Amino acid sequence: MLKGRNLLDPMDFSLEELEGVFKLADEIIESPEKFLHVCDGKILATLFYEPSTRTRFSFEAAMLRLGGQVIGFSEPNSSSVAKGESVADTIRTVGCYADIAAMRHPKEGAPAIAAMYSEIPVINAGDGSHQHPTQTLTDLLTIRSLKGDLSNLTIGCCGDLKFGRTVHSLVKALSRYKNNKFVFMSPEELKIPDYIRKEILEKNNIEYKEVSKMEDAMAELDILYMTRVQRERFFNEDDYVRLKDSYILDGEKMKYAKKDMMVLHPLPRVNEIAYEIDQDPRGCYFKQAKYGMYVRMALIAKLLGVR
């Protein structure tokens, strides 16, 4: 049972619990009309201390499609945070009004602090460059639905691997499934963090390699996970400008890829995926966005104990 639990890290749920979420998402996709009222009378609080379009809209759409309601803020200046209120006090107050909360915060660990003081389930909707577990659930459901399995895959991660919280969460999650291998493609300044390399991959004897050119790895990939270079993570604008166009996926590079490779992206994109790829059936990132709403519907229903 996931009722009353928090989701702060993709490792919080066992593989069996994750599969339960995915199976419920499958049911929702198959028969959404059966779930129109399962959250009647329930309220989701969206506490977004950082800008977001897709994640926030996805959570809100998920709750509304379950029959629930949504309260919250989309940037801290519109809340008591601007007056200096702590995360602990905010979540305790919000818990008086809502049944479940989704929090995005620029500081790593902020949702975990909120969960310590909260009497309602807290979902980490992204904390700094640390974790983004509901994006990971989205990614896993997309791969599972389109590939049929989450094992025996070669996954390429490309772009900003240092600050990209979606990559960190995805590598941790897919490392739990059998016989997965990773290929990391990034500029030297944006390489995968040591803690992922040492504590997740090497500690568990998971095969990985790092390459400097996308073309060197494309032919072996089952999944290509693209990310943007995030301007908001840079203190120096010159560094951002120098690195932002480091890796761009276009039709020429796709010629090296398998016919059934999947291209995923957590969105928003800037220019790291050429628009011509949108017409390629291997470009699955907009399907991925839709799966995100369904998996959040399933997660909310599970944490509230209504399914």
From Swiss-Prot:
Pathway: Pyrimidine metabolism; UMP biosynthesis via de novo pathway; (S)-dihydroorotate from bicarbonate: step 2/3. The gene is pyrB. It is an enzyme of class 2 (transferase). It comes from Clostridium botulinum (strain Loch Maree / Type A3). Gene3D superfamilies: Aspartate/ornithine carbamoyltransferase (3.40.50.1370). Heterododecamer (2C3:3R2) of six catalytic PyrB chains organized as two trimers (C3), and six regulatory PyrI chains organized as three dimers (R2). This is Aspartate carbamoyltransferase catalytic subunit. Carbamoyl phosphate binds at residues 54-55, 104, 132, 135, 267-268. Belongs to the aspartate/ornithine carbamoyltransferase superfamily. ATCase family. PANTHER family: ASPARTATE CARBAMOYLTRANSFERASE, ORNITHINE CARBAMOYLTRANSFERASE, MITOCHONDRIAL. GO terms for biological process: 'de novo' pyrimidine nucleobase biosynthetic process; 'de novo' UMP biosynthetic process; amino acid metabolic process. It holds the Pfam family OTCace_N.
